Structures are given as structure tokens and as C-alpha cells.
């Protein structure tokens, strides 16, 4: 690889998390138990149907443009027809944006091995998804639930040079999509799909090498593997004097190898023309206000500067469900460090052990539990026990605390009664060691916690013990 360099460009298809599809009112859902259930005559291209633009999809596109520091090409929203015949496209064309992409000239800054690098975005456009194909021996089965789902296709310039950089770019883009609630961006379920175009050339050479496309990569780690495999294959071929031909490959995660799919001989003529059934519209007329993107890098910096473990920060921004839970909890608790600790370490840690899912009820219960902690109704140990019980029983922490006797004793009168009895039981020991105050404090506090099964509030116990010892010393002096 010393005399060669890789040139990589990436196209990413992102399924937007809107309630309905791009041009119809059909639910934007994929459910393997309900095949061909969420469909509409518009998605199937039935005669007499007219597409309607999903305004929320336009809003999310504007949000992404702001997050990627892009400018809309024009304030006009224009769609085109891309014609090709394939079984997953019932209309015989796809509604997309060819001549007027939604936005151009963006940037995502990545950090690889402590070196920052800008990855430049050429453009992105809105379009509709195709049906999902299922291959069953000699049959191709089609699920039209996905057909018509709102997509954004993000295209980089060929400025990526290593598999590590490609992975870092996709991870950063994914985080931007998640924190701005644009998409769930899960590679494993197809809501974020990347096509990596890889070529190799001699260092210093201006002309690009033969481009090979790699599709169907279902994880960030596999993106890195697939690109490294292809770079090494191309370098070896060039060293051996072989001629490379344009082709499309697929990554097989079972064998950890790239598999040949088809040749790419000529540029296909898709016969683009403006979609006649969607009027050119003014974006400002569609939306009441322009959205402002969530500042991902600022958010990460503030948390890390507050001594939050960087790995926990990554965990929050890498998962749409966890980030949404963080936002919900922290909007009430208003303490990001405590929110991350109880959400990521305690709750999600227990969920992972039991292979359970994070639910809306658990999120609300965790808010209640943290508030109970702040009000000293439970201590740290009790809170951890309650999390386990919340997951097992699906009951709220207040009722569980009462049921399992896990509430902290904070009533001063009740604590004084317990401590007074311990003083009486240990009177000789106390008087004997009255000048060794720390030893006596530890002895009494330990017995209080033992007698109350760690339910006594430690701070209040300490104050009461300190006052009572002061009285004993005053009396005996």
C-alpha cells in the first residue's frame, strides 16, 4: 500500500422516521409479521392516484441541511421521475430529485487517530423507497410495506482515503441523524443503508482508478471490513498487472467476504423528467419556520467537560431510543451527569443482563426513582435494588419501595428513638471511649444501619449521633 492510495465516496440512504410515507398517507412502518399491510394505491402506482408531498419529510430535510452546514439549492421544491423497470418499483419510475437536489455543499468533521478531517458532502436529495425483496429459492417475494417510505440520499465527494475514515464518517452522520430525530438510522434494519464506492490509484496520480461499488453492509464494523478487503484486492490486482472492471459487490457477513453481484458496464439512461403530478412549490410556503439543528459536538463537549465518561456519551448519541430517553429524563431532572449514570449504567446495564427492552414506562419510572433519590426517600443501594424490581415486575418504584420495605427512614423522631436505644445498649462502651469520638460514631452508625437494614438516612443519622455524643460529653465533663 506504500505507493497506492484509496479514494472512497459514500452514498447513504436514510429512511426518515415520519408517521406516513413520502407521497401517500400509508403508515411508514415495516413489520415482518404484517407483510404488504401498510400500503396505499399511490405507492402501488394504481391508475388515477396523485402523490402528495409529506411536509414533515421536508422539515426533516431542512433540519439535516442545517446540521450538515448545507445550503438549499433553491427555495423551490422540485421532483423528478427516474424511469427503470424492476419488480420492486410498481410505477415503473421512482420519484426523486435529480436536477434540483434539496441541498448542496456540506461537511462532516471526523476524528480518526486524534486527527480531524473534514468529509465534504456533495449533495442530498429527497426520494421514495422501493419495495423490499425476499429471495426464496427460485422465487422473488415482494413486501410493499417499504415502498414509498421517505428517503434522503446523502452523497459525499470522493475525499475518504481509508476504511477507518469511512466508518468514522458513517458513525458521525448516524449520530447527527439520531440527535436531530431525523431517522432511527439503524443499519441492521435498513433504515440507514450505505453504498461505498472504492477505487485505488498510485499516489500523486490525478486520474481516479476503476470504481467498485459495495452494497448491503449492515454494520459499521462490516463497512470497515468490506472496504479494507476491497482496497487490498485492488492493490494486489494492480501490482500483478491485472485490469479491473467496474462491478457491484455485496458484503457477506457470514463469510466476512465481498461477493460479486453484477458488472457495471454502461451508464444507464433513466430518462429523467420533472414529475408532472407534483407542482413546484416554495419551501417557505410549506413550513411555518425553518428548523435549527441540535448541536451534537457542543452537546458531547459539555458532557465530557463535566467529567462524564466519553464512552457513555457515545452510547447516548449512538442509539435513538437511548438518546430520546436521555432527553425525556434530563428535561425533568436537569442534571445530565446523574441522568446518564442512572440511565446508561444502572438501568440499561440491568436491561442488558436480562435481555430486556427500554420502554416508555421504564423511562417514566426512572424519573420517579431519581426524584425519590433527590428527596432522600431512598438511598443509592435501595435505588439499585428498585431498578431490578422495576424490570422484573413492571411496577412503579414508589409502590415497590413500600412493598419491599425499601424506603429510607428520614423521620427525625423515629431515628432518634432507634439511636437512643443503641446508646442505652452500648452505654459502657461509649463512656469508656468518649474521647475517641470517631470510633464511637462508626460503632453507633454501623449498628443503626444494621438495625434498619440500611434504610436509615446516613446524613441524618450522623447529625443525630453527633448531637447525642456532644450531650454525653457535656454531661460527663
UniProtKB/Swiss-Prot annotation:
Family of this protein: Belongs to the GatB/GatE family. GatB subfamily.
| Organism field | Mycoplasma genitalium (strain ATCC 33530 / DSM 19775 / NCTC 10195 / G37) (Mycoplasmoides genitalium)
One function term, GO molecular function aspect:
glutaminyl-tRNA synthase (glutamine-hydrolyzing) activity
Keywords from UniProt, A to Z, are: ATP-binding, Ligase, Nucleotide-binding, Protein biosynthesis
Q: Name one Pfam family in it.
A: GatB_N
Please describe the quaternary structure of this protein.
Heterotrimer of A, B and C subunits.
Q: What is its EC number?
A: 6.3.5.-
The function of this protein is: Allows the formation of correctly charged Asn-tRNA(Asn) or Gln-tRNA(Gln) through the transamidation of misacylated Asp-tRNA(Asn) or Glu-tRNA(Gln) in organisms which lack either or both of asparaginyl-tRNA or glutaminyl-tRNA synthetases. The reaction takes place in the presence of glutamine and ATP through an activated phospho-Asp-tRNA(Asn) or phospho-Glu-tRNA(Gln).
Q: Which reaction does it catalyse?
A: L-glutamyl-tRNA(Gln) + L-glutamine + ATP + H2O = L-glutaminyl-tRNA(Gln) + L-glutamate + ADP + phosphate + H(+); L-aspartyl-tRNA(Asn) + L-glutamine + ATP + H2O = L-asparaginyl-tRNA(Asn) + L-glutamate + ADP + phosphate + 2 H(+)
Q: Which PANTHER family match?
A: GLUTAMYL-TRNA GLN AMIDOTRANSFERASE SUBUNIT B MITOCHONDRIAL AND PROKARYOTIC PET112-RELATED, GLUTAMYL-TRNA(GLN) AMIDOTRANSFERASE SUBUNIT B, MITOCHONDRIAL
Recite the lineage of the species. Answer: Bacteria, Bacillati, Mycoplasmatota, Mycoplasmoidales, Mycoplasmoidaceae
Protein name (record) = Aspartyl/glutamyl-tRNA(Asn/Gln) amidotransferase subunit B
Q: Which GO terms describe its biological process?
A: glutaminyl-tRNAGln biosynthesis via transamidation; translation
